[in-house]
Amino acid sequence: MKDSIQIKGARVNNLKNISLEIPRRKLIVITGLSGSGKSSLAFDTLYAEGQRRYVESLSAYARQFLGRMNKPECDYIKGIPPAIAIEQKVTTRNPRSTVGTSTEIYEYLRLLFARVGKTISPVSGTEVKRHTTEDVVQCATGHADGTKFLVLCPIRIPEGRSLEQQLDIYHQSGFARLEYKGEVCRIDEFDSRQADTEQMYLVIDRLAVSHEKDAISRLTDSAETAFYEGGGEMMLRFMPDGELHSFSIRFEADGITFEEPSDNMFSFNSPAGACPECEGFGKIIGIDEHLVIPNSALSVYDNAVVCWRGEKMSEWKEWFIRFNSERGFPIFKPYYELTQEEKDWLWHGVPSGMAPRKLRSEKLGGKEVPVPAEWTICPEEREWGLLSIDAFFEMLRQGQYKIQNRVMLARYRGKTTCPKCHGTRLKPEANYVKVGGRSITELVDMPVGVLKEWMDALTLTPAELGVAQRILTEIRQRLQFLQDVGLEYLTLNRPSASLSGGESQRINLATSLGSSLVGSLYILDEPSIGLHSRDTDKLIKVLKQLRDLGNTVIVVEHDEEIMRAADWLIDIGPEAGRLGGEIMYNGPAQPLPQDCQAGTSHTLDYLTGREVIPVPESRRPWNAFIEIKGARANNLKGIDVRFPLNVMTCVTGVSGSGKSTLVRDILYCALKRQLDEAADRPGEHVSLEGDLQMVKAVEFVDQNPIGKSSRSNPVTYVKAWDEIRRLFAAQPLAKQMGYTAGCFSFNTEGGRCEECKGEGTVTVEMQFMADLVLPCESCHGKRFKQDILEVTFGGKNVYDVLNMTINQAIEFFTAHRQPRIVGLLRPLQDVGLGYIKLGQSSSTLSGGENQRVKLAYYLGMEKHAPTVFIFDEPTTGLHFHDIRRLLDAFNALIQRGHTLVIIEHNMDVIKCADHVIDLGPEGGARGGQLLCCGKPEEVALCQDSYTARFLKEKLDMQ
């Protein structure tokens, strides 16, 4: 190939000296079993070299600030462009980072509001403008020719001067008249002793409307004089009906001076825009709404406010109901149905959004408080302030000398929405600025799909369009990219730290599209994670868009649709670990060769139908269950869901439909608390019911690393290494030398090499180049002192055992009759990890391998207490062949009396479940409903479910 990336002799990790050519400007999928060497080729070879070469081209000064990549171990790589890796990691934990800021959409929104936003007075609803003489001329010429009018300005009296003295100065300056109570009179004839300056204006000029050049020039001069004399204010009074028009060169209206819009005014990361109460975080430490009202399905009358229960505290509930029901508060309405104004009424004592003119000031609880004019104040309110939850806790604060009050305050304290900005993070002034009748905080609260529709429908004046056209184009494009990658359910104010790995990766993908880079190498790690089959087509379209810009797009992927849509397919195998690392296929994705020998490539076998994951012949029956009632956290719509026990349940639905909220935030946390274990506060729900006595433990199994340190390895995780160390300590030479089991640990002093602290390698820091990792000169990479290595068992020392694979170790310890060690290692073999070495660092394991190590740990546990295992997308990083093994491990857990609840999009797993719970129909606000539940065959018949359509194909129910 002429235009290609050429790799010769790649030997990174388990790659077997491979050489291959990869075409440029194509969509390439690298696939293979978990642990076969896909990431070693894509990230540790291609990305490392592409990034290293780019960084090497920079100055030594710039290089010291950038992450330095190791030079991959290979003979040469030719034709590689600068590389960008988009991984499945949540890249930020910064609480200030949101979807809007990370995609740069929020920066463009700030610019839009700063340039074309209109400030609207909250008092009268009129637009706040800084007037010019052109506005004055425009107002005057809008009347009929010949209409007489006065040019007026307010009379300003400097400190230390009387009205009479000021009028005398005006007269000496050439002004002859003033207007008082609508009447024009001469200054020299005016009696100023009883005059009210509020109703008095200086007459600058008397004119008639005319479009002639001289008349307009005179009006402009008079307007400038009026602005000067009036301190920035002036008026036009039209005759004969006395119509008055006010103008101000100050940015004010209704007696309030407003801040002029600027882009920093809308930034919660700038002191100019951040809410002063929460400093732009949107949350403060205060009274937690969810602790005060844990069940939002209840009304105030039905004891929704838990701190108002009990003999003494229930007085507050009675007072609130007695007085506020008369004022119009809906005491029988469930809390979740209350409007924001009604919630503010309950919390703060007065409905929000009331016009100031409808309020009067009253001294309540020792403070001046604005209250609605028509309200009658009761004695309790005079003592404590307006009856509300806030007033109740203020009463407790005042009595903090009582221990019961301090306990009560501590019980309800937590992170809560900032009462000043209501979680918007911005100063209240930012909400006065509108574009198309909406504030910036309203826009970032909309789901991306709804915001895109609103932006498309937005109409601006030609002058505004001239300023904002480019900004609008950027916003619309970026919103479209987010929709294209299946994230239309997210809002722009969603914190980045709350996103899943898949969502975070697809946001980075959308941001990359927005940057329109060309001629680069993009390497993506399973972008389909967390994506429903419905949205895979959209993702493929985005990947092809990225390719069509002139980029080379390499995707490490297991999704069948993405494999078939690729231009080029690279399969690495045949197995995993030391049995992998070879190129099994490197060629066009379509058409696939039909004549390759069965068993040489698992990928081609599955894609051509020679291998399949079979549908179970029958589903397990169940009677016992756990039920969550009234689940209402995030977007869930008060649903009741049953989770059967001792079977495999899959929770399905499109991205953002509420699966993680239901399973992780409610079921897992509620079960942990039910078992009296420490857990985060469960998401909002009414109750957890069912056969709870049958559940003795709950475990959440994710793909996070089992240990981030290079010392951690799978054999220590499953507790097999402890037994192996005891075995070596029991050998005659070890006993003779007084060695304990601790001497055979590379983590503690005694037997390990102290030069490298048991690592086997020494890291040499290089200032401008990648750090060098060299074998330890003292132990030659063997991690232990020489005298420890002299202790052998079956002819092998401790280093030899660490170098064995799981399969070799099982064979070795079986031959030497060590059933306990074999029993601890066997589960690792059962979950398909027989290829990894006993001493292999956990940091080198893939996400799928990490999860299977955890599975092996649970399979090897001796206790058989019925446990609920919760898995969040366990097929991430797993090939079709790995999924078969995973399902075998799942079945082994169920046979031991355990329960499995799995959040999953993979149809091969869903079709093998005993029970499916499908949420939807869409993501975000349009999701959160229970569409259907039952056996896969029953769910496949559901008309409203996207899952059903794809499940029907997998079950051959056409």
What are these regions (language model features)?
Residues M1-Q958:
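Conserved phosphate-binding elements of NTP-dependent enzyme cores
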